[in-house]
A protein has these predicted regions:
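A cross-family phosphate/adenosyl-ligand binding-site feature
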Residues: 1-211
Length: 211
């Protein structure tokens, strides 16, 4: 196995092309871990980094982690306009959330988000910010509006006065859930605990003592 390879953990994202957006929160340092976890489940990645994100983690690190294209600035290819199976922004700063909500396109990442909204591709945000910013009523208005537009937002727990991003495994699990939720061949599973009853008629039933 080469240093850039990853061990397969599942196939829930097999054949899926995901745009991983990275904005300028300090949680960008975890981007390598998230990228490799996405690949472990079969995803192909294109990365789009804001200028602020590049001050925290280098494009070289993401190139190693993803083995995919890294978009760092405007260019003639405009790869950010490609059709993706989902756009995952992790971490998502409040600035990115607000700019996307209001249709501001000041970076390739914001253009990718607007294009995804236009073609109804799934958009997933994993915010990271200081607790005071997260609890600001304007932040709630922004996130409520994005949710109403169909975006998905994964909030982490509060620690050390900050709303940190959730664990990388949970980010990937939520992403796979969102992408596969419209799959017509998706299975619905019922898990029961303890005894269960199944009616035979109005007065009789069959019951097992445990599951």
């Amino acid at each position: 196995m080469r240093d850039t390879d990853v061990a397969t953990s599942g196939t829930s994202l097999a054949g899926k092309h995901i745009l991983l957006g990275i904005s300028g929160g300090i949680a960008a340092v975890d981007s390598v871990r998230i990228a490799r976890e996405l690949r472990r489940h079969g995803a192909t990645l294109t990365v789009c980094m804001t200028n602020s994100a590049q001050n925290i983690i280098t494009p070289l690190a993401l190139s190693w982690a993803t083995q995919g294209e890294i978009i760092t600035d405007w260019d003639g290819d405009m790869s950010q306009l490609s059709r993706f199976d989902a756009v995952l922004v992790c971490p998502a700063t409040r600035n990115i959330l607000a700019c996307h909500l209001h249709g501001i396109i000041s970076s390739p990442l914001l253009m990718a988000l607007s294009a995804a909204r236009g073609n109804n591709s799934p958009i997933i945000f994993a915010p990271s910010m200081h607790s005071d910013l997260a609890e600001d009523s304007i932040t709630s208005e922004i996130t409520d509006s994005l949710l109403a537009q169909g975006a998905h937002i994964i909030w982490g727990v509060e620690e050390e006065g900050k709303r940190k991003t959730v664990e990388h495994t949970q980010v990937v699990a939520e992403t796979a859930h969102v992408i596969n939720s419209s799959n017509e061949r998706r299975k619905s599973v019922v898990i029961t605990l303890g005894a269960t009853q199944s009616p035979v008629d109005d007065v009789r039933y069959i019951q097992n003592t445990s599951s």
